[in-house]
């Protein structure tokens, strides 16, 4: 049973690492230059702090996911994994939420603040950001599954209901 638990955990962590890496890479490659009423406009992920936060958060999640694979079952480090998984899940939730909010402003603008939508002018850039968000949601969902599976694995020995 321990081998099966380790295998499932490893597969989930590798999938989460892959999705996190994809999210960060897609966001980093989001860049477009266009002309708008004769004015050259450049859209780049590094111009938006929440997008930079997104890249850093998913790079951290990628590295953590790979490091977590090194923890031996039953070791002190493996006991800290659940807490660390929750922390990484919260980090990713914040990154996806911040990026989603700013993306919505880029897509629809904000009439009250006087911010115009930009996605009509830089469609490839906005598509890249959307792709990064989708990969980010997948990674976040996988982290949720990792947390639920880890909770189950921790609680199972405590339950005498078998």
From Swiss-Prot:
It is a multi-pass membrane protein. It comes from the Eukaryota. GO terms for biological process: multicellular organism growth; response to auxin; response to brassinosteroid; unidimensional cell growth. Its main location: membrane. Keywords: Cell membrane, Membrane, Transmembrane, Transmembrane helix. Residues 29-50, 101-128 are extracellular. Pfam families: CASP_dom. It is found in: Cell membrane. Residues 1-7, 72-79, 150-162 are cytoplasmic. GO terms for cellular component: plasma membrane. The chain crosses the membrane at residues 8-28, 51-71, 80-100, 129-149. InterPro entries: CASP/CASPL, CASP_dom, CASPL. Homodimer and heterodimers. Belongs to the Casparian strip membrane proteins (CASP) family. This is CASP-like protein 1C1. It comes from Sorghum bicolor (Sorghum).
């Amino acid at each position: 049973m321990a081998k099966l638990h380790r295998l499932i955990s490893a597969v989930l962590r590798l999938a989460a690492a892959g999705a996190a890496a994809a999210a960060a890479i897609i966001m980093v490659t989001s860049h477009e230059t266009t002309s708008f009423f004769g004015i050259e406009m450049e859209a780049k992920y590094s111009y938006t702090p929440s997008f930079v936060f997104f890249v850093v958060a998913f790079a951290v999640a990628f590295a953590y996911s790979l490091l977590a694979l090194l923890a031996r079952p039953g070791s002190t480090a493996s006991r800290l994994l659940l807490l660390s998984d929750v922390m990484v899940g919260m980090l990713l939730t914040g990154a996806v939420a911040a990026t989603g909010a700013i993306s919505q402003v880029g897509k629809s603008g904000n009439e009250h603040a006087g911010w115009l939508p930009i996605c009509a002018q830089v469609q490839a850039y906005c598509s890249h950001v959307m792709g990064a968000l989708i990969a980010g949601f997948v990674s976040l969902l996988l982290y949720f599954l990792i947390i639920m599976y880890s909770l189950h694995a921790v609680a199972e020995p405590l339950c005498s209901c078998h």
